[in-house]
């Protein structure tokens, strides 16, 4: 029995040698190093067609807010201050000075907007809604009812509203019902 267990462990360890590493993933797309700050990528796969004789009639989606500004001012100030001191000391390379300039612009743009939805975040939800509309037009015909819910966090509400605005641009006859309130505890992880 011990030999069987050792053989199985050896087999799995050999198979793991063929697995992708984080380093390989980052070489393909450095932005993935941003972890949960990585902007939502557009899908690159095609949809599976509906089975013969079947047609879409309903869509249910659960989404997180789009890209947002960092939550704390310090998350902008810390790298800015490091780069400022290095720049003032003449220790930055040409590339370092460019990074310092970009960090300065980002810091200024985010000022007093900590945690709010970015323009990219709003655009992401319009794009998601447009893909739903393009992929399943029959669901959005005529006076179809759209029932949307959000947490009371403003970036979530604005994300939802951007998606709804995009859908109504495609079909102004849609009946939209949207709501955001603390009574919807299931959206708040039960903490509402």
Identify the meaning behind each predicted range.
Residues 21-192:
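Long, internal stretches of domain cores in catalytic or enzyme-like folds
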